[in-house]
């Protein structure tokens, strides 16, 4: 189906965090809000219509994901990433940050080290610190306007700090890097060597363009 991506919808004054934040903080309202992953085009009409039917029912009780939900998810990953995942592998969470925090608590103990690569989506450091784990940063290198992984530093930080868990952002937010297969393989090799568990946030995996192709960490 065709979709009009050029339609402009004014979201100011609608309790929209993305646009109202500037006014609420006494800043110029013309500031471009590039700090949050919030789309500026309306939801698909089919989705809005389905939600409308649900709200018309008038009861907002507990619900559960049924088979069509799982089949859509499994089909998407097989079609776009050639990965045949199993329904039993899936765990529903309220959101990606909650999932990251749950992983930190499940796979590490207070006082243990968790690795990240800054600059990175700010909740990464929050879920580590808020759960009393130690933040270890292996910063990305900016080379000729292009961010790269410093693998020597990456391995040294893991070894010197006895890192237990690595939070990977793939594709990387905010630098926009779509990691290549060989980069993910090298990450995997190092982490396996030192027994480091990798938690990969791939929420932006569907948003690549041109010759960039997202590679799943699991299948690399």
Task: Annotate each language-model stretch with its function.
Residues 2-95:
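N-terminal small-domain helix-loop-helix segment of the aminotransferase-like
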């Amino acid at each position: 189906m065709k979709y009009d991506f050029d339609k402009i919808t004014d979201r100011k004054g609608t309790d929209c965090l993305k646009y109202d934040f500037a006014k609420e903080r006494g800043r110029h309202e013309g500031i471009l809000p590039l700090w949050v992953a919030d789309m500026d085009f309306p939801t698909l009409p089919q989705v809005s219509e389905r939600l409308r039917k649900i709200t018309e029912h008038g009861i907002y009780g507990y619900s559960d994901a049924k088979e069509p939900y799982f089949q859509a998810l499994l089909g998407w990953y097989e079609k776009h990433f050639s990965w045949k995942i199993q329904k039993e592998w899936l765990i529903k969470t309220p959101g990606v940050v909650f999932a990251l925090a749950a992983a930190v608590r499940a796979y590490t103990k207070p006082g243990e080290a968790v690795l990240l690569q800054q600059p990175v989506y700010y909740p990464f450091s929050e879920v580590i610190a808020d759960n009393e784990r130690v933040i270890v940063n292996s910063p990305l290198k900016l080379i000729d306007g292009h961010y790269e992984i410093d693998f020597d530093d990456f391995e040294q930080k893991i070894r010197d700090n006895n890192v237990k868990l690595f939070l990977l952002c793939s594709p990387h937010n905010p630098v926009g890097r779509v990691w290549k297969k060989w980069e993910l393989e090298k990450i995997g090799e190092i982490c396996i060597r030192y027994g480091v568990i990798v938690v990969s946030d791939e929420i932006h995996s569907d948003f690549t363009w041109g010759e960039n192709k997202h590679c799943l960490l699991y299948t690399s």
